[in-house]
Structures are given as structure tokens and as C-alpha cells.
Amino acid sequence: MRHPDLPSSLTVPAAWQATLRLRFAQRGERTALTERRHQGPLLVQKPLYPEGGICHAVILHPPAGVAGGDSLDIDVTVEDGAHAVLATPGATKWYKSLGREAAQHVRLTVGAGARLDWLPQENIVFDDARARISTVLDVAPGGSAIGWDAVVLGRQASGEQWTRGALWLDTRVGTGERALWIEQSHLEAESPLRTAVAGLDGLNVLGTLWAVGEGATQELAEALAEQLPYTPELRAGVTCLATSGQSMLLLRVLGRQMEAVRHVMVDSWQALRMPIHGVAARPLRLWAT
């Protein structure tokens, strides 16, 4: 069936199918990017070492946006004992889909004694976009990972609202077959949950931060909670989830402005990095540009 906004004479552009495979391994005193394979417009910049032996890499998507029918597949493995920091240089824009779904699938695998910081910029969902964003994180015993995702519903800079479309957010965090946390969310632009007090309460920026590792304790969650804001415009909360052999902290942020939500997540990452990774936090140079 033709989308109602799509003229019959218009040819739907070809979709991008892009993949990126990265592997990091410890080589002597530092972590090296030992494998990089890509197909389509997903690339990684030359690794940098602003923190000694910790490998920093920036993932690039030159089109800068994801249109209907596009699919991005990112697979990252951090081998035993290695430490990688991954980021993106700018927001991922989810364009008007013309009735077709766009998707990004991320799989992160962290080995025993390995550490990962997954710090992408936010996702901006344009009006009439249909976006599916999934993340699977597998952390081996003794490994640790801190990461986040943020979504902005509508283009705040231009005043555009998100009035049509759909968003799927699927996340799984665990160790092998044992899951610590599974979430499958489906939000329609016209859903009453967007304005319900028990839902988004009219706010349009959602942030989630997870921290997995032996240091993810209830005491740490309580200490972090004391620093979090809770106002009509910016709300954050944290909880500790644990199973035999693994634990994690889950931080939720809901706000009206991306900048405010970003500050909460960055401040939380800085507070968590030492207890989770055993490494002091240093803000990424990328954030200052």
C-alpha cells in the first residue's frame, strides 16, 4: 500500500545496508584495534590514546542520518583484559520514513576483565520517522561496561514536533544466556503515554545509562541517587539490578532539553567510572568540539 504522503510518481530512494565489525585486544601495555570490517557507510576513525593504553575510537556514519529502509549493524568485541572507549561525533538523525521502517542494531561483547565505555551522541527522531533501535550487551564475569542511549522526539532546534511515526527501543543486558535486564518498548507518536503523568508527561527527551560490573552495588546506586535531579522539567532515577555473578545500575533520565539530559548522563558516567572500571573519568575531547 502506498504511503498517503508519497506521490505515485515519486521513486523511493534505495536504502543503505551498512555493517561495521570492530574487535579490540590487549597488546602489551595498550589496547589495539585488531579487526575492522565495514560494508556501506559505517566507518571508524584511526584509534587515539588520550588515556595511555586505553583505545578510543570514533564511529562515523557519513550520511549523518537514517532514512526509511536503511539498516545499520554495529558489532563490537572487547577481548579479555582490553579497554575501549567508543563514541560518535554527532547526533544520529532518523528522517521521515515514507512508511518504511529504519533500524540500527548494536551488539557489544565484553570479555573477562575487559572494560567498555559506549558513549554515542543522541538519536533525533524526525516527524513521521519509524525507527527501531536495538542494543545487546554481553559482559563476561569480571568484565565491566558503562554506556548510554538518548532519544529526542522531534527536532528541537527547528521547533518541529513528533506528531506521526513510531519508535521501537529494544535492549538486552546480560552474561551469556543469563539476562540482567531486557526491555522492549514501542511508542507511537500519537500514543496517550506521551502526555500521561505515568508516561512521558509531555517531556520529549529520554535517556538511559547502564553500568555493569562487580562495582555496581546498591550502595553505589544510593550514592548516585543523591546527586540526581527531580524537577518538572528534568527527572532522573537509578536502580540496582543483580543476579548471581553479575550486577548493574540502571539510570533513567526524562527531560525537556537534550543538553540538560546530556549533563546528567555525563556527570553520572564521571561518577561511575572509577567504581565500575577502576579508572578515573576524563571527559572526551569530542565533547568539547
Swiss-Prot record:
<comment type="similarity">
    <text>Belongs to the UreD family.</text>
</comment>
<comment type="subunit">
    <text>UreD, UreF and UreG form a complex that acts as a GTP-hydrolysis-dependent molecular chaperone, activating the urease apoprotein by helping to assemble the nickel containing metallocenter of UreC. The UreE protein probably delivers the nickel.</text>
</comment>
<dbReference type="GO" id="GO:0016151">
    <property type="term" value="F:nickel cation binding"/>
</dbReference>
<keyword id="KW-0963">Cytoplasm</keyword>
<keyword id="KW-0143">Chaperone</keyword>
<comment type="function">
    <text>Required for maturation of urease via the functional incorporation of the urease nickel metallocenter.</text>
</comment>
<protein>
    <recommendedName>
        <fullName>Urease accessory protein UreD</fullName>
    </recommendedName>
</protein>
<dbReference type="GO" id="GO:0005737">
    <property type="term" value="C:cytoplasm"/>
</dbReference>
<keyword id="KW-0996">Nickel insertion</keyword>
<dbReference type="Pfam" id="PF01774">
    <property type="entry name" value="UreD"/>
</dbReference>
<dbReference type="InterPro" id="IPR002669">
    <property type="entry name" value="UreD"/>
</dbReference>
